[in-house]
Amino acid sequence: MFTLFRWGRLFSLVATLLLASVALGQNETLPRTGQYWFDYDPTWKISERWSFDADASIRLINSDPFFYQLRLYPTMQFSPWKWMDLTGGVWFIYTNRFEGADLFETRPIIGIKVKKDIWRGIRLSNYLRMEFRIQRDLDANKTLTARRLRDRIQAMIPINHRSLSEDKTWYTFTDVEWFHQQDPEVDDGFNGRRRYRAGIAWRKNSTWTYQFFYGFQQTTSNLNRPLSNDEIFSFSLIHNIKQ
């Protein structure tokens, strides 16, 4: 049974994030977009320590002008200890900008995640990644490269159980992520970014999890582009495939 206390924590978390988003959006002179993300995230358990993730995503960005992205994130994960994951992969991103040149990005990444389960199944984690971005303008046949560092700190909180791994578990999560592009040449113009998310998920069983989050991000820009605020609405279907 859900306790009033745990639901209260969830509502307080979401309310705080919404209020912060409103505060960021009070300056009407800032460009503002709505983004809608849909993900199918299958993960294959190869062995006790190795797994392979192949997240596929479509992102609709309601900016001026409108554009969409198709993303594929094949990633290997090695877990030498229960509290640490090492990741590496090559991501692929196609951007259709309609009124501008289409883009294709190849993005090798490496990362390390450290995590700790604390009181009542609450899990804290820190996920640090380095990306090498290779972006090609498909109309002009130009290629730009940039390195980007990103760091995400997250808390996951089970609601109706004291573990995140039990069947029929509801849980909430919140995180903040910082992005720092070290070479501000890639065409998206994003020199720095902060992203805040809060969401809820239902772990049906060891195979299926359904996840929704609301987030907002604030982006600083190079190339003389203005600061922008973005609202994000995301739904993910997480599919754990046994060996």
Feature annotation, model-predicted:
Residues F52-A54, M84-G88, I122-L128, L149, ...:
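Transmembrane beta-strands of outer-membrane beta-barrel proteins
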Residues I112, A155-I157, N229-Q243:
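Outer-membrane beta-barrel "beta-signal"
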Residues I46-R49, W83, D117-L124, I159-W170, ...:
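Short loop/turn motifs that connect adjacent beta-strands in outer-membrane beta-barrel proteins
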Residues W44, F78, V114-K116, I157-I159, ...:
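Residue-level signature of outer-membrane beta-barrel architecture
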Residues A56-N62, V90-N96, K116, M130-I134, ...:
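Transmembrane beta-strands of outer-membrane beta-barrel pores
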Residues N27-G89:
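Start-of-domain marker
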Residues A20-V22:
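N-terminal signal peptide c-region/cleavage motif recognized by signal peptidases
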Residues R32-Y36, Y68-L70, F104-P108, T143-D151, ...:
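Residues that define the transmembrane beta-barrel architecture of outer-membrane proteins
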